[in-house]
């Protein structure tokens, strides 16, 4: 279940955001849900052992903002408003979001009144056992340990052997929460395809905390039903903070070449 949400400002004034805006989009999503539903989703979510999953994700803003310097800080300005994609495997989340958002229509975003001007439900896609995906928001996977009473977080890169395994373990937990079935027999493997460790590394500040993620195009092989859950809920960690959303990617040059043959 996916939708593209478009927000505009009053009288075409445009919308101004900080460079690191994930927490603001998350706030916007929760604000546009019914209050009781939003509180339960945020505080409880869907439990798997000690872990709690929100089972939704969202993309980066789809438009390129214009840089502006205000009070010595760089900001992003969106003169025509902005759009982002939202996904969830839970029908009730998307239903509540769209219904409540259409009723309210407006929300406060850093003192700016923004309006939900358009909702586009995305068509379903067919997922295959072998395909390519492109991240619409950085994928992050990490492990937190305690060293001398201090919590330390180690972020893994696609070059690390644990990267794929941790993504798989995370996806299996989400699969169980969505379907109620064990995913122990299901698997997938992900390989960098069009990827550069320098160009595709993304460090996002989320409420002041740096989170390391990765963008780019990857090849994935695995069970479509497991991939379907990650398509709707996101790959990796921090999905509800705007990480791990992906789309099916096709090499246009290869398609054009095949059409000529």
Where do the protein language model's features map onto the residues?
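RNA-interacting cores
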Residues: 1-261
């Amino acid at each position: 279940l996916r939708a593209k949400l478009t927000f505009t400002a009053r009288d075409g004034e445009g919308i101004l955001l900080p460079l690191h805006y994930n927490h603001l989009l998350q706030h916007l999503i929760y604000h546009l849900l019914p209050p009781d539903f939003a509180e339960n989703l945020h505080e409880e979510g869907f439990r798997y052992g000690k872990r709690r999953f929100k089972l939704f994700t969202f993309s980066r803003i789809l438009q390129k903002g214009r840089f502006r310097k205000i009070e010595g800080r760089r900001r992003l300005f969106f003169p025509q408003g902005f759009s982002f994609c939202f996904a969830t495997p839970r029908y009730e989340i998307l239903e509540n979001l769209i219904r409540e958002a259409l009723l309210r229509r407006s929300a406060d975003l850093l003192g700016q009144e923004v309006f939900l001007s358009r909702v586009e439900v995305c068509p379903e896609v067919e997922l295959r056992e072998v395909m390519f995906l492109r991240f619409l928001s950085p994928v992050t996977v990490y492990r937190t340990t305690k060293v001398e009473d201090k919590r330390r977080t180690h972020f893994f890169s696609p070059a690390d052997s644990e990267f794929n395994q941790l993504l798989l373990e995370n996806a299996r937990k989400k699969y169980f929460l969505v379907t109620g079935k064990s995913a122990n027999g299901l698997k997938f493997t992900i390989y960098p395809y069009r990827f550069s460790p320098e160009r595709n590394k993304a460090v996002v500040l989320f409420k002041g905390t740096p989170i390391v993620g990765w963008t780019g195009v990857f090849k994935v092989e695995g069970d479509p039903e497991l991939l379907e859950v990650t398509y709707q809920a996101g790959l990796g960690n921090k999905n509800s903070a705007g990480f791990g959303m992906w789309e099916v990617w096709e090499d246009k040059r290869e398609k054009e070449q095949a059409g000529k043959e």
